Design a protein with these regions (language model features):
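AAA+/SF3 P-loop NTPase mechanochemical coupling elements
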Residues: 59-65, 99-117
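Conserved AAA+/SF3 P-loop NTPase catalytic/coupling segment centered on the Walker-B
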Residues: 67-91, 124-129
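Conserved catalytic/switch belt of AAA+ P-loop NTPases
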Residues: 83-106
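A short helix-turn-beta junction within AAA+ P-loop NTPase domains corresponding to the substrate/partner-engaging
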Residues: 124-144
Length: 148
């Protein structure tokens, strides 16, 4: 959470917030996605998104400049081939792109941080390591959680 706020404030220095917690539980209905969706207060909910399609890299880059928290819900659905793209996006500090019908490029700061959820424990497939993902096994007490 500190890294996310530092990213928003532009305090990350030369590095972007490139670590994403992955909430993991083999049981469905543990409110992992619900928990992610309420991390931001109501006033900032328009900066939260849980639709992140890696097939359009330019669309992904635009979301990095528009949203504060991107939930990669059901993280295990992302293919091994998409992981290289995702890792690259996670380390970007600034975004350079050309808007439609413009002849020049614009630079925008990246404000987005990532979080993810999965019902699979064996979801990191990179044989060289996965330093960008911090898997956290959760056992959320649904009854207590729903009181929030």
């Amino acid at each position: 959470m500190l890294g996310m706020v530092a990213q928003w404030m532009g305090l990350e220095g030369q590095c972007a917030n490139a670590v994403a917690p992955l909430l993991v539980s083999t049981e469905q209905g543990r409110c992992k996605s619900t928990f992610c969706s309420i991390l931001l207060p109501e006033e900032l909910q328009h900066f939260y998104i849980d639709k992140f399609d890696l097939s359009s890299e330019s669309g992904c880059e635009q979301k990095l400049s528009l949203f504060g928290l991107i939930n990669m819900d059901e993280f295990d659905r992302y293919s091994v081939r998409n992981m290289a793209t995702l890792k690259n996006l996670m380390q970007l500090k600034k975004l350079t792109f050309r808007k439609s019908h413009r002849s020049y490029y614009s630079q925008l700061p990246r404000i987005a941080s990532f979080i993810g959820t999965s019902n699979q424990k064996e979801l990191l497939t990179d044989t060289t390591g996965s330093r960008r993902f911090l898997c956290v096994e959760v056992n959320i007490d649904k009854q207590g959680f729903m009181l929030l």
